[in-house]
Amino acid sequence: MAGYKTNRRTKNAGSSLEMSHFIDAGANKIKSKIRDIERLLKKKRDTLPDTVIIEKERTLDALKLELENAKVRQVIKKNAKKYHMVRFFERKKALRRYKQAVKDLEDKPENKKYIKNLEKSKIDLCYVVNFPKTEKYISLYPVNEEENSEHDADSNLEQTKLRREAFLKLVEQQYKENTLPVSLQKILQGKKLEKENTGVTLNKPNSKSEDAIVRHAHQEEEDEEDDFFE
């Protein structure tokens, strides 16, 4: 998800004067206005002029879209507060590892291990910066996996690991395609995700695309285990 939807410049945004009070408003205020309009249309649809009905319906559609935006903003705000420190320290750690990988490769440019380490450090750094604001942050360098599971009694540590790998694969893919919200070059210039950019995102849960990425990550993990025991 590059950013959440906006209705600020659509022709069907309803009355601009009426909507101006609800752009960037809280969810409760928007819900209250939605209920007011729905009650009005339900009770007086037969007596209201067609132009008023059309205007109210457009405003209603715009309000519902703005409500979704408000919900996204709430999640982003909550996650920003909760994961600010861990993301800050992981960004520093990833940047430090990247710089070390660059230095190592400069010393031994033909070393295959150093080449691989540099590529990995690039993806890790891009992961930390571009991880979606709307998701619970999955630590790239957890002391233990319980940090990511938040100590839930029924936490699925394997699923957490698979989702991390899925996001890493997605970041790697967008890095190669040069479609990351914040490119490696911009990250090295100190850039972060812009306010209305939510970062990379997998498709909706249980979608075929996400399932495919998770399955691919799981298969690679199994292949590595097979190689180890051979």
Swiss-Prot record:
Biased composition (Acidic residues): 220-230
Localization annotation: Nucleus, Nucleolus
Region feature Disordered, mapped onto this chain: 195-230
Keyword set includes rRNA processing: yes
One Pfam family here: Efg1
Transmembrane annotation, as ranges: none
Bias type Basic and acidic residues, positions: 207-219
Keywords associated with the record: Coiled coil, Nucleus, rRNA processing
Superkingdom of origin organism: Eukaryota
One biological process term in Gene Ontology: re-entry into mitotic cell cycle after pheromone arrest
GO cellular component term of the entry, any: preribosome, small subunit precursor
InterPro entries membership: Efg1, EFG1_rRNA-proc
Principal location: nucleus
Record carries keyword Coiled coil: yes
Coiled coil start-end: 27-75
PANTHER family, sorted: RRNA-PROCESSING PROTEIN EFG1
Main function: Involved in rRNA processing.
The family this protein is said to belong to: Belongs to the EFG1 family.
Name of the featured protein: rRNA-processing protein EFG1
Organism: Vanderwaltozyma polyspora (strain ATCC 22028 / DSM 70294 / BCRC 21397 / CBS 2163 / NBRC 10782 / NRRL Y-8283 / UCD 57-17) (Kluyveromyces polysporus)
